[in-house]
């Protein structure tokens, strides 16, 4: 299957994203969305393997340059791997899920989605962040320190008391809390306009000839991957060891 024309047209405008190489294109939601943070943080962990495998990465988010600068500084995503649009024009052209659109503006829709309405899997994924998951990799190393605002710091060794090699109880919830503190403390930097806070994203892995090796459309909040326990599982067979 050939990649959508709208996607190929956009990639033609981006240096380094021409055909002749495999390309991973990630359409993030609003930069201030938790999904955007988690997806970027997952991608940062495989950047060397993507490069070694000859896969060019391009993330496209909703926001502005100031938000993109801060987003990349916080998540570690290289700034040249992220471009931003002030409106979800490409998202709409690809018919990605716009989220609930009830009367009263975007906030009622977002709150309903956070409650799992029109956002399948959200509540289960929230719960997984607290309960832990033995099928998922650990998120916080023993020597890592997670900053929660200005004063509170949590050391990874705290989770080490519960074991290692899997996602411990409250571990993912702590990562999400750190992301939330960052977003809420700089809301207007990450979200210049509230109009698109329900918009979801998608993923496209393209072959050298522009055919689609893999694609996924986000179905709801905390649903940026079909396998949230290992969000990049779809990439494993394409990455160098």
What are the residue ranges of the model-derived segments?
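N-terminal "domain-start" segment that seeds a small globular fold
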Residues: 1-19, 38, 42, 233, ...
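Residues lining hydrophobic/aromatic ligand-binding pockets adjacent to catalytic sites
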Residues: 55, 199-200, 229
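Short, surface-exposed basic-aromatic patches at helix termini and helix-loop junctions that form
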Residues: 48-49, 71-77
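Short active-site neighborhood of thiol/selenol oxidoreductases, capturing the structured segment around
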Residues: 14-50, 56-58
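Thiol-based oxidoreductase modules, predominantly thioredoxin-like and allied folds used
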Residues: 52-67, 79-87
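A short, polar/charged loop-to-alpha-helix boundary motif
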Residues: 219-240
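Thiol/selenol-based redox catalytic cores and closely related redox-interacting motifs
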Residues: 85-220
């Amino acid at each position: 299957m050939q990649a959508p024309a709208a996607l190929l047209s956009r990639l033609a405008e981006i240096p380094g994203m021409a055909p002749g190489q495999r390309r991973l294109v990630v359409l993030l939601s609003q930069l201030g969305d938790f999904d955007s943070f988690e997806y970027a943080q997952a991608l940062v962990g495989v950047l060397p393997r993507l490069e070694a495998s000859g896969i060019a990465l391009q993330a496209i988010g909703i926001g502005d340059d100031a938000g993109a600068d801060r987003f990349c500084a916080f998540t570690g995503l290289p700034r040249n791997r992220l471009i931003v649009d002030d409106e979800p024009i490409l998202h709409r052209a690809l018919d990605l899920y716009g989220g609930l659109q009830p009367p009263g503006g975007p906030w009622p829709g977002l709150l309903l989605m956070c409650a799992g309405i029109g956002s399948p899997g959200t509540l289960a994924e929230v719960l997984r962040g607290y309960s832990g998951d033995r099928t998922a990799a650990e998120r916080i190393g023993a020597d890592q320190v997670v900053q929660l605002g200005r004063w509170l710091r949590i050391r990874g060794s705290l989770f080490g008391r519960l074991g290692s090699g899997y996602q411990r109880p409250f571990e993912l919830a702590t990562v999400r809390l750190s992301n939330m503190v960052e977003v809420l403390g700089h809301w207007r930097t990450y979200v210049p306009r509230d109009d698109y806070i329900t918009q979801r994203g998608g993923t496209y892995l393209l072959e050298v000839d522009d055919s689609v090796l893999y694609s996924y459309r986000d179905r709801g909040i905390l649903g940026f991957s079909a396998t949230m326990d290992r969000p990049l599982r779809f990439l494993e067979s394409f990455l160098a060891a």
